[in-house]
From Swiss-Prot:
Name of the featured protein: Adenylosuccinate synthetase
Subcellular location: Cytoplasm
Reaction catalysis annotation: IMP + L-aspartate + GTP = N(6)-(1,2-dicarboxyethyl)-AMP + GDP + phosphate + 2 H(+)
EC number: 6.3.4.4
Organism the protein comes from: Campylobacter curvus (strain 525.92)
GO cellular component: cytoplasm
Residue stretches in coiled coil: none
Amino acid sequence: MRKADLVVGVQWGDEGKGKIVDMLGLNYDMICRSQGGHNAGHTIWVDGVRYAMHLIPSGILHKNIVNVIGNGVVVSPDVLIDEMAQFDHLEGRFYISDRAHLNLTHHGLIDQAKERLKGDKAIGTTGKGIGPTYADKISRSGHRVGELLEPERLCEALMSDFEMNKSLFNALGVKIPKRDELLEELKRYKEALAPYITNTTRLVWKALDDGKKVLLEGAQGTLLDIDHGTYPYVTSSNTISAGACTGLGLNPKEMGEVIGVIKAYTTRVGFGPFPTEDKGSDGDKMCEVGKEFGTTTGRRRRCGWFDAVSVKYASRLDAVDKYALMKLDVLDGFEVVKICKAYQYNGETIDYVPTDLENVTPIYEDLEGWDSVKGVTRYDDLPKNAKRYIERIEELTGVKVGLISTSPERSDTIIR
């Protein structure tokens, strides 16, 4: 039996997992999503064409790869149907877990209303209803994709839920759908999605038992994990590598190589602690050159220097075997590049991530910059200072950099 390999984000998401999955995916028979929803964005550049996806695994661009949305994902039918329309002949190469939970219109409306009511205490959610959907799941009041196969029954269950929560809907100013309109919507979902709904756990098991190569595609990043991230400024699922097991029905012994994806700098969307954030011209340059605007929301990402402390912490949580270092070219032209090697915390120097990360001050190490790495495909051809930067990341985190991206194009990648 083969083991499933995993690509996981090791920062606050947006590390460039899509490009790595797209590139490595050519060597796999099946690619699976295990958690998150359409709050996650996958951006891939192929031959100068930009593909942005939020639910469908990146392997969908290759017609010989089977793509799976696992039980740990929360699925917006509207978003999924729109994404599916971009691709031809999905039959036999795309499947949705019947156990994945439904992210419906009212979840997004509730999410947005709660954020508005929080005012300056808002978390910075994408407003896509991910949190409310997972909340319904945990409270055992949610509904799953498999229920779409019986739209009349699901409609009655939802109307009952709405009636039970009428006071909450009214307080938030969220309009309860009309039964007839809801039923028509659910029937439309069934018609579009029914051919792809199945027990994906058995599907993945069979693939592994048959010796197929399976790749798991993580969403968001480790520092957004509901348990181990910068709570409450986190997502609503387990983004660490162990979440891939529960989100697909795999056991830990079925996990193979873990590839941790990191940017050569650091970004974050929304609120929450960010020790190495640069609010000056350097951060602005990273944002402009790196085109740091969210795939899902279009929001400008906060930018700053590489944080080796948080990456080392996340890498331990994920059991990372090697890194894929992304966007090294964005740092081209900086006279000095910085790496956070430790934190100042309560008068002490520490090399770990405390629970109250907002109370740390980064301790930087300055390294000399380089002119350009753009388009380089051989490690030996990199400038000396760029190599030193990569080696210093390895020294501080204890993990080897195995892949290096030097432009958005799939082909501009160094494999060591």
